[in-house]
Amino acid sequence: MSQSKADYINVIGAGLAGSEAAYQIAKRGIPVKLYEMRGVKATPQHKTTNFAELVCSNSFRGDSLTNAVGLLKEEMRRLDSIIMRNGEAHRVPAGGAMAVDREGYAEAVTAEIESHPLIEVIREEITEIPDDAITVIASGPLTSDALAEKIHELNGGDGFYFYDAAAPIVDKATIDMNKVYLKSRYDKGEAAYLNCPMTKEEFMAFYEALTTAEEAPLNSFEKEKYFEGCMPIEVMAKRGIKTMLYGPMKPVGLEYPEDYMGPRDGDFKTPYAVVQLRQDNAAGSLYNIVGFQTHLKWGEQKRVFQMIPGLENAEFVRYGVMHRNSYMDSPNLLKQTFQSKSNPNLFFAGQMTGVEGYVESAASGLVAGINAARLFKGEDEVIFPHTTAIGSLPYYVTHAESKHFQPMNVNFGIIKELEGPRIRDKKERYEKIAERALKDLQTFIDA
């Protein structure tokens, strides 16, 4: 039940998530106070004062239902997403992707929200978290310092922090399990890591490729942040071979298992170097490359990291990225509704929750907005099915392992697997997952 006596809901931030949340609340007949500081205080990234501005790319990525983000967009269309609707109206040719005229699209979103009779737009910076009403905080990946500090305090001084790098994540089903082995260093605890052993020859070839690979350019607003964070693997490698062999590729305590039949240097019991893969989701379908945060171009990541034994044909569900970002320890702090566990009147949405990408941010705003509206009306919360893309995102960010939690794009690896024998053909498997998702979503909507 709602614990607020106010006759409106606050939404802080009019980016993709905040705009979507405000619209979803207002369409359910509830007044919204939408706060946006752009217009009175600029950010390093934004070029306009329009809502839902696309800062970097103008692409909403793949549009096919055999692409997880394509499935997510279709689900959002069926849920009347203001972001998807205006994006569709301002599409530009982009092959199999959905790209938009960024100015026309953002202007349309802004006009629709500003003209909505139930949405009051307030152009000012919020430095305190309102306690007068149910509130959705969607202040973006570079939340202003004052508000960031308040969120930090609200969460008990824990869980609102910066990251400068993320390592690539691969689909376990595409790892060659004949070339890797399960083991924890020195056999401590359960065998929790997949280990990719390298001979000296394999390591030297990999090292050469890594140190000569092309890095992605930094946006101007990222340059200062680049040097503040954890070190990219390619920068570490350029400090010398020993930096790698005594660092992320240290082989000590990771001896070959007795039944290992792959290549090795002579009769050595320990590989020359080892790349470790760590389980990344509860279902065990995703693994990240431990210590391999990177800022290489995506094509270079694929080329270089597929040199790792066992990853020759690996499918990367997320490439490594390097940029400063604010995000929460969502597994400990948020419910699957994007509602605060400690304050039921408070919701969070957007990249600060640990979803990565334009579409994912808007989707989180949609879920948070719907649930904020339901709380206002005294109705039960809704949790979208884990078989859908829009249900799998909040499930992932609230059920991931907190210690190693990092932002995530939507991908088929986080959606609940199909029942029955695994379909080997990837396209057919994804088609079946999408078919089930849309069917389950429609059943959910009709209920």
UniProtKB/Swiss-Prot annotation:
SUPFAM superfamilies: FAD/NAD(P)-binding domain. The keyword Transferase applies. One of its GO terms (biological process) is tRNA wobble uridine modification. Its cofactor is FAD. Its EC number is 2.1.1.74. Keywords: Cytoplasm, FAD, Flavoprotein, Methyltransferase, NAD, NADP, Transferase, tRNA processing. The keyword Kinase does not apply. InterPro entries: FAD/NAD-bd_sf (IPR036188), MnmG-rel (IPR002218), MnmG-rel_CS (IPR020595), MnmG_N (IPR040131), TrmFO (IPR004417). One of its GO terms (cellular component) is cytosol. FAD binds at residues 13-18. It catalyses: uridine(54) in tRNA + (6R)-5,10-methylene-5,6,7,8-tetrahydrofolate + NADH + H(+) = 5-methyluridine(54) in tRNA + (6S)-5,6,7,8-tetrahydrofolate + NAD(+); uridine(54) in tRNA + (6R)-5,10-methylene-5,6,7,8-tetrahydrofolate + NADPH + H(+) = 5-methyluridine(54) in tRNA + (6S)-5,6,7,8-tetrahydrofolate + NADP(+). It is found in: Cytoplasm. GO terms for molecular function: flavin adenine dinucleotide binding; tRNA (uracil(54)-C5)-methyltransferase activity, 5,10-methylenetetrahydrofolate-dependent. Catalyzes the folate-dependent formation of 5-methyl-uridine at position 54 (M-5-U54) in all tRNAs. Belongs to the MnmG family. TrmFO subfamily. HAMAP family: TrmFO. This is Methylenetetrahydrofolate--tRNA-(uracil-5-)-methyltransferase TrmFO. The lineage of its organism: Bacteria, Bacillati, Bacillota, Bacilli, Lactobacillales. The gene is trmFO.
